[in-house]
A protein has these predicted regions:
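Core beta-strand elements of the Rossmann-like FAD/NAD(P) dinucleotide-binding domain
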Residues: 7-9, 202-212
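Glycine-rich FAD pyrophosphate-binding loop
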Residues: 28-49
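Dinucleotide-binding Rossmann-like beta1-alpha1 core, especially the glycine-rich loop
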Residues: 52-136
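Beta1/beta-strand and adjacent pyrophosphate-binding region of the FAD-binding site
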Residues: 5-19
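C-terminal accessory subdomains/tails of enzymes that are appended
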Residues: 3, 8, 40, 86, ...
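A conserved short coil-to-beta-strand element within the FAD-binding core of flavoproteins
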Residues: 178-193
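Short hydrophobic core segments
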Residues: 14, 208-218
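Flavin (primarily FAD) binding-site architecture
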Residues: 215-228
Length: 496
């Protein structure tokens, strides 16, 4: 990539999470010359550690955030349309218990508003009596149950959604580079004019020039921000755990109220697993070191066990636990759940456009707003990109992986028994989805690391053998990459 040295782009995007990749896609589709650099892998931070929900945000109604709910519902329907292979409708059951903070009247009113905002955009919600609720979800505690409601949102593969945006940006002419970190901004007369970037594994640092720069690094502290307003951001830690779904027994998604602190939480179906989350606590941890604590795990187990008395989950049931940091526009409040999930966009004195906050669901509209600002800063007439009607790539993914399996039978063997991932998934991840490391493949192009108790460590050597010829790894490099994966697993999935 050193051939980029000295090149001048219209836009430099720093950060390959969902926001950065969405911005790069939108800008490239408008005809701008775009370069995006991500220091690790696409979605390796917050974007790949979400609840994997594309949702209207029904819980935001309680705080009166009607604009955010309306935008989220609109964007949910947009994503269902442009990425049906990645975004799927999902039914949620919300049980109601006697004396609960959210009772029948409050939930009914909320769902009515939710439905009115989504008119013509989703299936209608409906209510249940106690017997119907238990019939729908027999795993639930029946004592004190007075009824329930069913409403519809959507789920996704957060990492693959991010990668799809990166691929779309590249397909529209953007230069999209992962595992290459921006180490310093270039400035002339106080204005940012480019950056010095350095590949993660090999190669010398080089310069990239740009007329506009978007900092989409979220909570990463990188020294790029010079404006005090843009520094007013805080990190909220969100922890999820996964357990065997048969231990819980949920048929669909469940929306619950934690008896510990009254927060809305979810129990979500994920194939043979159930994902339970999430926490919401202020943290000073860095995104590179954030992890689930014993207290986080115990909170989620205690909250879940209040609803699933037959399960009585313990720490031994936890297959995986992981944490991400939500970048929130800072507020002087004790409870991070009270902070709006709406985004903020601030242009600092050097001309860098900094974005903080936002939701996975609303990334596309947020990117559109950011690129509008970029075009104004470049004195360009606003051009509308058809990001809301152009399908994201990847619809042929399953077909292409099946073709690889037919062409090479050795690639059809499951990497782990009872899981769908094969060597063909790894080959496809490298050839098509820009994967470069074992973590890229086992954590994000597949979810094998989330779905095995050893987080894929037992197949790391085999995975390295499969992709080594594609990535040009020598024997020594293969060993280095396996050790790198072991460190990544400990950092991401360790509980302390």
């Amino acid at each position: 990539m050193t051939g980029l040295s000295g090149d001048k782009f219209d836009l430099l995007v720093i950060g390959g999470g969902i926001t950065g990749c969405g911005v790069a896609r939108d800008a490239a589709m408008r005809g701008l010359r775009v370069a995006l650099f991500e220091g690790d892998d696409f979605a390796s931070g917050t974007s790949g550690r979400s609840s994997r929900l594309i949702h209207g945000g029904i819980r935001y109604l309680e705080r009166g955030q009607l604009h955010l709910v309306h935008e989220s519902i609109r964007e949910r329907q947009t994503l269902l349309r442009i990425a049906p292979h990645l975004v799927k409708p999902l039914a949620f059951t919300w049980p109601i218990y006697r004396g609960a903070r959210v009772g029948k009247l409050k939930l009914g009113a909320g769902l009515l508003v939710y439905q009115l905002m989504a008119v013509g955009r989703s299936r209608r919600h409906f209510t249940l009596n106690a017997a119907e609720t238990v019939a729908r979800e027999p795993c639930l505690k029946s004592a004190g149950l007075t009824g329930g409601a069913v409403y519809y949102d959507a789920c996704t593969d957060d990492a693959l959604l991010t990668v799809a945006n990166a691929l779309s940006a590249r397909d529209n002419g953007a230069t999209v580079v992962s595992h290459t970190r921006v180490i310093e901004l270039l400035r002339e007369n106080g204005k940012a004019t480019g950056a010095i970037v350095k590949p993660q594994h090999a190669g010398e640092a080089y310069e990239v020039r740009a007329r506009a720069i978007v900092n989409a690094t979220g909570v990463w502290e990188n020294g790029f921000i010079t404006d005090e307003r843009a520094r007013r951001r805080r990190g909220s830690k969100g922890v999820h755990i996964s357990v065997a779904r048969e231990r819980v027994g949920n048929r669909d998604a469940l929306t619950l109220i934690s008896p510990v602190d009254g927060r809305v939480m979810f129990c979500l179906p994920a194939g043979p697993q159930a994902i339970i989350g999430t926490t919401d606590t202020w943290t000073s941890d860095s995104p590179e070191t954030v992890h689930a604590s014993v207290d986080d795990v115990d909170y989620l187990l205690r909250s879940a066990n209040a609803y699933f008395p037959r399960a009585q989950l313990t720490r031994d049931d936890v297959m995986s636990a992981w944490a991400g940091i939500r970048p929130l526009a800072s507020a002087s409040v004790t409870n991070p759940s009270a902070v709006s999930r709406e985004h903020s966009i601030i242009t600092d004195s050097s001309g860098v456009i900094n974005v903080t906050g936002g939701k996975l669901t609303t990334y596309r509209s947020m990117a559109e707003e950011i690129v509008d600002l970029v075009q104004r800063s470049l004195a360009q007439k606003r051009q509308r990109a058809a990001t809301d009607s152009t399908e994201l790539p990847g619809a042929d993914r399953a077909k292409e992986i099946a073709r690889l399996q037919r062409e090479n039978e050795s690639l059809s063997t499951p990497l782990v028994e009872a899981l769908p991932y094969t060597g063909a998934h790894l080959v496809y991840g490298v050839r098509v989805e820009m994967a470069q490391t074992l973590s890229d493949l086992l954590i994000r192009r597949t979810h094998l690391a989330f779905e095995t108790r050893d987080h894929g460590l037992s197949v790391a050597h085999r995975a390295a053998e499969i992709v080594a010829p594609l990535l040009g790894w020598s024997g020594e490099t293969k060993s280095d990459r396996v050790r790198e994966y072991e460190r990544d697993v400990e950092r991401m999935f360790g509980i302390t």
